[in-house]
């Protein structure tokens, strides 16, 4: 009995030691990243690229301006003074993706004099269905540069500064002060908090948009005396597992187009002093029923950590650490299973080619299964694994040791969750997942297999 207890202590101790080693490694990686970010920010500053050069101040419209903007100049509430304000304004757009492209397009064409474009990413074919400034021929180049090319064709009078870098806690405070209005067109929680805190500290209106699947949201933070900030509404970040991105959940391009265009609209209203800015309210767009709802959101939180009269946060922090998520929407590779609970795609391919009896469960949603599947795969969405409703369907295979079970998904994360769950019910059955999922299949087994 005592020996057994000592053994279990030893096992527990070994586990804790492993955990400590993992945490130490994570800490070292963060330290390294911090050094890289600092270096990148220094380089950027050294290149003199960060500062928007002193803006020209215009006092009148040119003939070309009058001809170009005539249809908005004749608007009673807009007029010459509105156009002059736009011409002298500077707007920073963070993210030149689904939201940022239409927002930039409407701001440049309306005559916003100075646009800053921030995006660290490059154009990919899967962006083109909604990121309307980019083109097939510009795949592979910086999104900020690609957007600049398109925008200058639209309006050569617009001055455009590109920052083809990740906006982070070092460069944000150098870039943002030069701009009048900031547009959050990013796709991740860490960047939302970073932009919020920077805008709150620097007192810049932040036009925040988001879109997923068929739905979108829009509001303006940090606007005026009483306008709440993002932290007033969301004091703590959501748990990482509750966050879905466009790459996983999907999105319709016209939804991002709708919200992006409205972000441009709110920015123009802020600059020109037009209408009623969407602060303290949130627009909820349900694309499937085409309904726009405007809900009142709470005002400034008296104890908000960043925008209250006695803030706890007076400088930018490490937002990836704070949110437990990276400042991008790419999935982190999970490490849930032991190596013996996984099989690489080459070994699986060999076994399947030799026609060894087995069952291959594909745990992606049906819409994704319809796009492409591995030979003989059976679609059992992850939800059916987790609620155990698959058990009855595969009772025969689960009873027979002759049927090793393999689980596959798109990138090898959900498949691990599925195996971990199935193992709790069938600990003695051989159940393994395909490492790195179908992406690895395309890379290592069949380059003609579609990737998405
Ligand atoms: N901190 C940041 N600094 C600079 N750019 C950012 C930052 N966070 C997000 N972005 C950019 O914001 C954009 C968000 O747009 P969107 O989600 O439509 O594009 P995406 O990430 O290319 O899409 P997908 O998920 O389909 O690959 C991306 O281009 C992304 O690179
Ligand atoms: Zn606040």
Swiss-Prot record:
Main localisation: cytoplasm
Descriptive protein name: Adenylyltransferase and sulfurtransferase MOCS3
Catalytic activity: [molybdopterin-synthase sulfur-carrier protein]-C-terminal Gly-Gly + ATP + H(+) = [molybdopterin-synthase sulfur-carrier protein]-C-terminal Gly-Gly-AMP + diphosphate; [molybdopterin-synthase sulfur-carrier protein]-C-terminal Gly-Gly-AMP + S-sulfanyl-L-cysteinyl-[cysteine desulfurase] + AH2 = [molybdopterin-synthase sulfur-carrier protein]-C-terminal-Gly-aminoethanethioate + L-cysteinyl-[cysteine desulfurase] + A + AMP + 2 H(+)
GO cellular component, one term: cytosol
One MF annotation (Gene Ontology) recorded for this entry: URM1 activating enzyme activity
Active-site residues, Swiss-Prot/TrEMBL: 246, 409
Binding residue positions for ATP: 98, 119, 126-130, 143, 187-188
Function comment: Plays a central role in 2-thiolation of mcm(5)S(2)U at tRNA wobble positions of cytosolic tRNA(Lys), tRNA(Glu) and tRNA(Gln). Also essential during biosynthesis of the molybdenum cofactor. Acts by mediating the C-terminal thiocarboxylation of sulfur carriers URM1 and MOCS2A. Its N-terminus first activates URM1 and MOCS2A as acyl-adenylates (-COAMP), then the persulfide sulfur on the catalytic cysteine is transferred to URM1 and MOCS2A to form thiocarboxylation (-COSH) of their C-terminus.
Keywords: ATP-binding, Cytoplasm, Metal-binding, Molybdenum cofactor biosynthesis, Multifunctional enzyme, Nucleotide-binding, Nucleotidyltransferase, Phosphoprotein, Transferase, tRNA processing, Zinc
Keyword Metal-binding found: yes
Pathway(s) it belongs to: tRNA modification; 5-methoxycarbonylmethyl-2-thiouridine-tRNA biosynthesis; Cofactor biosynthesis; molybdopterin biosynthesis
Binding site for Zn(2+): 229, 232, 304, 307
Subcellular location: Cytoplasm, Cytosol
């Amino acid at each position: 009995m005592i020996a057994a207890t000592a053994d279990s202590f030893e096992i527990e101790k070994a586990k804790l030691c492993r955990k400590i080693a993992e945490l130490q490694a994570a800490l070292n990686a963060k330290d390294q990243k911090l050094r890289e970010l600092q270096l990148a920010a220094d380089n950027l500053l050294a290149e003199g690229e960060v500062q928007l050069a002193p803006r020209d101040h215009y006092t009148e419209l040119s003939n070309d301006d009058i001809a170009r903007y005539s249809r908005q100049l004749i608007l009673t509430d807009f007029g010459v003074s509105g156009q002059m304000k736009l011409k002298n304004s500077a707007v920073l757009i963070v993210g030149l993706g689904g939201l940022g492209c239409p927002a930039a397009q409407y701001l440049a064409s309306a005559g916003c004099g100075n646009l800053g474009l921030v995006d660290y990413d490059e154009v990919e074919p899967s962006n083109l269905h909604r990121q309307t400034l980019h083109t097939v021929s510009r795949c592979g180049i910086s999104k900020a540069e690609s957007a600049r090319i398109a925008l200058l064709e639209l309006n050569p009078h617009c001055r455009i500064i590109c920052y083809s870098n990740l906006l982070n806690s070092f460069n944000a405070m150098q870039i943002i002060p030069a701009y009048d209005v900031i547009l959050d067109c990013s796709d991740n929680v860490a960047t939302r908090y970073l932009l919020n805190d920077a805008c709150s500290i620097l007192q810049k209106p932040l036009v925040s948009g988001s879109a997923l699947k068929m739905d979108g949201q829009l509001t303006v933070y940090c606007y005026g005396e009483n306008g709440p900030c993002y932290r007033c509404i969301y004091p703590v970040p959501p748990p990482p597992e509750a966050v879905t991105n466009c790459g996983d959940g999907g999105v319709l391009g016209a939804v991002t187009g709708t919200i992006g265009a409205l972000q441009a609209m709110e920015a123009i209203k802020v600059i020109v002093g037009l209408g009623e800015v969407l602060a303290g309210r949130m627009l909820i767009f349900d694309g499937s029923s085409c309904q726009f709802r405007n809900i009142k959101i709470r005002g400034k939180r008296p104890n908000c950590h960043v925008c209250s009269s006695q803030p706890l946060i007076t400088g930018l922090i490490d937002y990836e650490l704070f949110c437990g998520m990276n400042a991008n929407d790419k999935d982190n590779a999970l490490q849930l299973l032991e190596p013996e609970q996984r099989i690489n795609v080459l070994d699986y391919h060999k076994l399947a080619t030799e026609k060894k009896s087995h069952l291959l469960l594909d745990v992606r949603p049906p819409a994704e299964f319809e796009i492409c599947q591995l030979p003989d795969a059976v679609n059992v969405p992850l939800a059916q694994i987790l609620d155990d409703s698959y058990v009855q369907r595969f009772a025969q295979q689960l009873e027979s040791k002759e049927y090793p079970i393999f689980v596959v998904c798109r990138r090898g994360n959900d498949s691990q969750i599925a195996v971990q769950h199935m193992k709790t019910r069938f600990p003695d059955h051989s159940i393994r997942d395909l490492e790195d999922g179908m992406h690895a299949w395309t890379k290592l087994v069949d380059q003609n297999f579609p990737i998405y």
